[in-house]
Amino acid sequence: MEITELFSKIYGEGRPLIILHGLFGMSDNWATHAKIFTQHGWQVHAVDQRNHGRSPHTTGHNYDEMSSDLERYIRRHNLNNVVLMGHSMGGKTVMNFVVRLPSLVDAMIIVDIAPKAYPVHHQAYINAMKSIDFTKDNSRKAIEAKLSKQLNNPGIIQFFMKSLYWKSREELAWRFNLSALEINIDEIGAALDYGYYNGPSLFISGGKSGYILTEDHDSIYEHFPQAGIVTIPEAGHWVHAEAKDSFSAEVLDFLETL
């Protein structure tokens, strides 16, 4: 299914920096960093990918489709000299995009994801969210309590809670399309198994994450010969949230070279 228009929040004026969130995330997750980057001459487009946030829901959810969504967004907004940044699933979208359409991109930043395949490891989260019956669990407090009984991770629970909204006056709902994401979970973990991008590239990994290992570096350089790889030791997978200042500094240092 073709997406007609992705939702985005646009901050500031200047050269375009497009940010793509990760699985179960949305553009709001990047508001703090967007405001920081606008202070350095960048117009930040924080985009909701398909099946997330305020963007349309669809049954399809793979990286070719999400890359095509991004292409339409760039062309519709008449953006030039674009820098792309993506976290986790968003990083896979960016990698797919730049090997297919390198002429539309000046540089890319990938946050805590490698081009390799990742085994399915989100099922506990999916099961916990599927257990919510919005016809009965009709308050944020009740939903948080139910999730807390199944997930021993307050940070993850609060991350999910940000995607709750009032579908009607009486009923809450997830902004993401949980059923489509579960059906396509293998696609979300798929490897980038073709192509290369020879433009400026930065990979930022969390030292406590385990998503980018030393043995992944060869694959990164194979697809992205100009890549720089930096590790923020104190951060886990949500590098931008767990080490905000260090992360912003690494990104800004890279952007200043462009």
Task: Enumerate the predicted regions with their spans.
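Alpha/beta-hydrolase fold catalytic core
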Residues: M1-I18, Q39-W42, L79-N80, F224-P225, ...
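Active-site glycine-rich loops that stabilize anionic/oxyanionic intermediates
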Residues: G14, G22-G25, S88
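The conserved beta1-alpha1 loop
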Residues: L20-G22, S205
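Active-site loop/oxyanion-hole signature of alpha/beta-hydrolase fold enzymes
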Residues: A31-A34, Q39, Q43-M85, M89, ...
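Flexible "cap/lid" loop of the alpha/beta hydrolase fold
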Residues: N96-V99, D106-D137
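Conserved alpha/beta-hydrolase catalytic His-Asp/Glu region
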Residues: V120, T135-A191
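Conserved serine/cysteine hydrolase catalytic core
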Residues: R169-H223, G228-T231
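Catalytic histidine-centered segment of alpha/beta-hydrolase-like enzymes
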Residues: A235-S248
